[in-house]
């Protein structure tokens, strides 16, 4: 269960206490990229259950840059490749395509 502790004025960042499901599940609940949350909090590893961290909502739309691959986009947002493709009803990505992040 998520304990929302504080919502920043810009509504893009907020503070949560990591619930029993763990850090990755908490990121999924808030559509946040795990690697970005770790960096945002200045951590070297995933926070443990009970830790209080700043979360940031991920962008819901992403424009594919010419140098990006499906793998790199999915790693950035912490989603599976099949998830991203299925969510957007596509079978591949191409430069300047706009995709919605699940």
Regions found by a protein language model. Name each.
Residues 38-42, 83-88:
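Short alpha-helix capping/helix-loop boundary micro-motifs
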Residues 2-30, 51-77, 97:
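Primarily a LysM-type cell-wall glycan-binding module
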Residues 1-3, 36-39:
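Terminal low-complexity, poorly structured segments
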Residues 99-101:
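Solvent-exposed segments in extracellular or luminal domains encompassing
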């Amino acid at each position: 269960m998520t304990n929302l502790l504080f919502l920043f004025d810009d509504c893009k960042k907020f503070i949560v206490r990591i619930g029993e499901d763990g850090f990755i599940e908490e990121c999924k609940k808030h559509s946040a990229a795990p690697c970005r949350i770790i960096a945002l909090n200045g951590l070297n590893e995933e926070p443990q259950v009970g830790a209080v961290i700043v979360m940031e909502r991920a962008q819901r739309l992403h424009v594919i840059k010419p140098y990006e691959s499906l793998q790199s986009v999915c790693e950035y947002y912490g989603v599976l490749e099949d998830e991203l493709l299925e969510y957007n009803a596509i079978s591949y990505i191409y430069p300047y395509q706009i995709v919605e992040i699940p």
